[in-house]
């Protein structure tokens, strides 16, 4: 847990595990047991990096507007910078906007997309989430219970572990009493389960379970779109990845491009690399049907405003064409 105001100044602990599932935050919950698992960690916070952080920040002006004289007050709570940052920033309070690249939410809070959002991941990337009280049932449990829940290998345990580890990046500090993962190899398995479930859901033609339908009524699965095929290839590469040690440097993942597909299996206009060392990944614009780079669109660490470089009236994202194939 990070030190609060009023406590003695302590060096920040090493950055938490940077979850591999950041790009798949909005994917449907997956099930199934995990096989091979690898843990990915942020680079350690060296004394040089900590020394470069400077003095603790103060609350923003809006938070102290009611204070007489407008004096800048210390933050109500200090949290680490987004991603793998080592310095302290003011935590976001309940009801404040949050996202992947914004300061984390305070203790007991998490960053959630708005209910009913069709693209929850995109909302979090754009900083359009909201800091709300944690919804998971294990919050407030004893450290022993939390640790036991964290080691659960059931379907719910896998999903909850993913949400917890991901929200440690987006929300408040993690559970101080949580035991370290015994195998040190859970994140990659959860990632594969999530990606598999994501494109499995995109490939479904209906809401009925196969086991409840007559065999004669079953239809062959629709053809995989280029974006879904690329997801398959990424899964295959990760499943055969052999790392020099169980820590798995983040650079191994950063070299992989995980395609951002929409609910129809087409490419989203904006594609981005993962963040690394607290630095926002590059983003670029692609054709939603082919995934190819749109000529003239920039590649920047921010929003390239892809809608300005793609004529939707001409191609209309090819949704009807894809459905007819």
UniProtKB/Swiss-Prot annotation:
Entries under PROSITE patterns matching the protein: IGFBP_N_1 (PS00222), IGFBP_N_2 (PS51323), THYROGLOBULIN_1_1 (PS00484), THYROGLOBULIN_1_2 (PS51162)
Domain IGFBP N-terminal: 38-134
Stored Gene3D superfamilies: 4.10.40.20, Thyroglobulin type-1
Biological processes annotated in GO: cellular response to hormone stimulus; female pregnancy; negative regulation of canonical Wnt signaling pathway; osteoblast differentiation; positive regulation of activated T cell proliferation; regulation of insulin-like growth factor receptor signaling pathway; response to estradiol; response to estrogen
Coiled coil: none
GO cellular component, one term: apical plasma membrane
Leader peptide range in chain numbering: 1-35
GO MF annotations in UniProt: insulin-like growth factor I binding; insulin-like growth factor II binding; protein phosphatase inhibitor activity; receptor ligand inhibitor activity; signaling receptor binding; signaling receptor inhibitor activity
Sequence segments annotated as region (Disordered): 198-226
Motif (Cell attachment site): 301-303
Thyroglobulin type-1 domain span: 224-306
Subcellular location: Secreted
PTM comment: Cleaved by MMP9 leading to release of free IGF2 from IGFBP2-IGF2 complex, which contributes to enhance the motility and the growth of astrocytes.
Disulfide-bonded cysteines: 42-84, 45-86, 53-87, 75-90, 98-111, 105-131, 227-261, 272-283, 285-306
Keywords: Disulfide bond, Glycoprotein, Growth factor binding, Growth regulation, Secreted, Signal
InterPro entries: Growth_fac_rcpt_cys_sf, IGFBP-2, IGFBP-like, IGFBP_1-6_chordata, Insulin_GF-bd_Cys-rich_CS, Thyroglobulin_1, Thyroglobulin_1_sf
Function as written in the Swiss-Prot or TrEMBL entry: Multifunctional protein that plays a critical role in regulating the availability of IGFs such as IGF1 and IGF2 to their receptors and thereby regulates IGF-mediated cellular processes including proliferation, differentiation, and apoptosis in a cell-type specific manner. Functions coordinately with receptor protein tyrosine phosphatase beta/PTPRB and the IGF1 receptor to regulate IGF1-mediated signaling by stimulating the phosphorylation of PTEN leading to its inactivation and AKT1 activation.
Domain remark in the UniProt entry: The C-terminus is required for IGF-binding and growth inhibition.
Oligomeric form and interacting partners: Interacts with IGF1. Interacts with IGF2. Interacts (via RGD motif) with integrin alpha5/ITGA5; this interaction induces cell migration, adhesion or apoptosis according to the context. Interacts with PTPRB; this interaction leads to PTPRB dimerization and inactivation.
Protein name, as recorded: Insulin-like growth factor-binding protein 2
Organism: Homo sapiens (Human)
Gene: IGFBP2
């Amino acid at each position: 847990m990070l030190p609060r105001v009023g406590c003695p100044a302590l060096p920040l602990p090493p950055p938490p595990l940077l979850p591999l599932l950041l790009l798949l935050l909005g994917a449907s919950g997956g099930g199934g047991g995990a096989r091979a698992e690898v843990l990915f960690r942020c680079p350690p916070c060296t004394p040089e990096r900590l020394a470069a952080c400077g003095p603790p920040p103060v609350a923003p002006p809006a938070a102290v507007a009611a204070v007489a004289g407008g004096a800048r007050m210390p933050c109500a709570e200090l949290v680490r910078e987004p991603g793998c940052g080592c310095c302290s920033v003011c935590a976001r309070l309940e009801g404040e906007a949050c996202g992947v690249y914004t300061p984390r939410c305070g203790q007991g809070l998490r960053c959630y997309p708005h209910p009913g959002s069709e693209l929850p991941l995109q909302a979090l990337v754009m900083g359009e989430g909201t800091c709300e009280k944690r919804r998971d049932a294990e919050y407030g449990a004893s450290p022993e219970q939390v640790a036991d829940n964290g080691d659960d290998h059931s379907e719910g345990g896998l999903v909850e572990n993913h949400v917890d580890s991901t929200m440690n990046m987006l929300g408040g500090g993690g559970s101080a009493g949580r035991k370290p993962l015994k195998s040190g190899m859970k994140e990659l398995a959860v990632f594969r389960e999530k990606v598999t479930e994501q494109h499995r859901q995109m490939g479904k033609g209906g809401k009925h379970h196969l086991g409840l339908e007559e065999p004669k009524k079953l239809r062959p699965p629709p053809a995989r779109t280029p974006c879904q095929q690329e997801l398959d290839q990424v899964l295959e590469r990760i499943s055969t990845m052999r790392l020099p040690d169980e820590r798995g440097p983040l650079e191994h993942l950063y070299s992989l491009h995980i395609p951002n597909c929409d609910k129809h299996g087409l490419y989203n206009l904006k594609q981005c690399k993962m963040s690394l060392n607290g630095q926002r990944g590059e983003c670029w614009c692609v054709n939603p049907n082919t995934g190819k780079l749109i000529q003239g669109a920039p590649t920047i660490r921010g929003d390239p405003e892809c809608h300005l470089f793609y004529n939707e009236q001409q191609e209309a994202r090819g949704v009807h064409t894809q459905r007819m194939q």
